Amino acid sequence: RGVTAGPHADIVTEAAKVAKERGLTVEVVEFTDYVTPDTALADGKLDLAVYQHRPFLENFNSKQNTDLRVVADAVIQPMGFYSRRIKSVDAVPEGARGAIPNDPSNGGRALLLLEKAGLLVLEKNRGTEATVADIVENPKKLNILELEAAQLPRSVDDLEIAVIPMNYVISAGLTPEGDGFFFEDMQAPYALIIIASRPDNTESATVKTFVESYRSPQVAEFIGKTFRGAVKPSW
């Protein structure tokens, strides 16, 4: 099963223990970027991928001409603003440097969050397809830097704001309560992580057993104890 490092790997590893009790052996394969897992899934090197939200999967399918499918909802983990220097949107200085993910849907997602915070205005109706070229108002003259998502936590020491997906927050040892100050709503569509598979195996016994194992009471309890509200089960 393909996952990105951090909480997704931890949760899938726990789900693998439950799956083993149900007769299914799961090999957990960790990746450090957002594109390789879906590529490996589409190529048949993986059976499932657990790390992305639905808009990211749709973008991948569109760009790569693939037909990966959502087989279940996984966990909820909102993106947020992180900083060592400031603790509120009001404290963001003019000319602040802000880092966002450089992959298409999470970059757009970060720009939408900056807009929600009142720091930017974007071209209308762009959604997660928004890019820095769609910024139509930038009242604080923010300098937006696009970085690999896994590198964003390192930028917290050097920049005023980093807009970071929760899995990389946790894997870097940051905490929402200690280092963050503005977040997506828990109900935001981009906060919901899904389990993806190929069309040829969505109905397979292997996939069904893994999904049932992942969405089990044991895994829900593990998530609650381990992540203390930063990540929540969707079931």
Spans of model-derived segments:
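Beta->alpha turn/N-cap motifs
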Residues: G6, E30-Y34, G44, L48-E58, ...
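Short helix-initiation/N-cap motifs at beta->coil->alpha
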Residues: V29-T39, R126-R154
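Periplasmic-binding protein-like
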Residues: G108-E115, Y214-S234
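Short, polar/charged alpha-helical segment
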Residues: A5-E27
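Short amphipathic alpha-helical coupling segments at ligand-binding clamshell hinges
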Residues: E94, T202-S213
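A conserved helix-loop-strand patch within extracytoplasmic ligand-binding domains
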Residues: V71-L120, A220
